[in-house]
């Protein structure tokens, strides 16, 4: 559902998902990639997804679904479950208000990354316009 209301942009999707559940940057620190609408099951969507999977472990297919990759079934299932949970929380937030009053800040993400020994790309830690 989020591909109908968020810009189809890796930075925006990653940041919104990260802000919706504190564990997200720890579970998918590289962020998520977004594929604009494409015919499902075809070569073009497969190639675009493969391109994104060079950088991310998660690809969101606009108006279709999600593709995840991990070291084994359990890690991959946990990854998909975490993304799905965060998306569900974000849908609930957006159903209540178009803007958040408080959220996890870039500095909070940096603290989290330090304490959990993960590296978060700075491209996702931008200051949002108020």
What residue ranges belong to the model's regions?
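Glycine-rich flexible loops
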Residues: 1-130
